[in-house]
Structures are given as C-alpha cells and as structure tokens.
C-alpha cells in the first residue's frame, strides 16, 4: 500500500479576521495573536462530499491514475452530509472505484 498522489479542496468563501471584527467585538490582532488564524474558508454551497470528491479527483490527477485503479478508500470526518451511504462510499461512486474497499473513520479529535 502506498500514497501515489495528494489533493486538496477548500470552500470558496473566505472570511477574514477583519470581517469578523466588523460584526463582533474583536480585532485581527487579537485573533491572530492567540490562534495564528487570519482567514478561514466557510462552506456555503459546498458539502463535505463535494469537497472530498474534488480533493480526491485532484489526487488522482496528481498521481496520473484513474479511479478504477484505487483499491482502498478511507474517509475521516465527523462532519459528513449523511450517515448512509458513508462518505467513502460516495467518493467511491463518484470516482468509479467500484472494486475498492471503502469505509469511514469517525473519531473526532482522537483521530
């Protein structure tokens, strides 16, 4: 077993610390000095499934392989769109990895 490609996907909407400071009693300096965070991506139209599928498609492209060549899909998230089918099985269907083993790991912070 090996990882042959990686991919990522972020929601389109970006909310900055200044955006937050405009609606609550805080500042960019206060947030960033305590957390290191300056911006965050907020999913408004995207779902966990759509983001995961886009990230997997990016990883497949990076690896130069087709979804049908995948043997195993493990999805790790506690914020799935639905309980059934699992996120991994939704990815499996989207990329055409019909013969792959697919399952989710839902372990929150302990994962």
Whereabouts are the PLM-identified features?
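Glycine-rich phosphate-binding loop at the start of an alpha helix
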Residues: 53, 85, 109
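Short Gly/Thr/Asp-enriched flexible loops that form oxyanion-binding sites at enzyme active sites
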Residues: 79-92
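Short glycine-rich or small-residue beta-strand-to-loop segments that form or flank ligand, phosphate
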Residues: 71-77
């Amino acid at each position: 077993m090996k990882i042959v490609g990686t991919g990522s996907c972020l929601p389109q909407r970006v909310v900055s610390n200044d955006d937050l400071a405009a609606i609550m009693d805080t500042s960019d300096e206060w947030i960033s000095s305590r957390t290191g965070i300056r911006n965050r991506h907020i999913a408004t139209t995207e779902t966990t499934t759509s983001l995961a599928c886009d990230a997997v498609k990016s990883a497949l492209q990076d690896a130069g392989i087709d979804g049908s060549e995948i043997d195993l899909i493990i999805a790790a998230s506690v914020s799935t769109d639905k309980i059934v089918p699992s996120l991994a099985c939704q990815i499996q269907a989207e990329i055409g990895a019909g013969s792959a083993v697919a399952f989710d790991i839902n372990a929150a912070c302990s994962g």
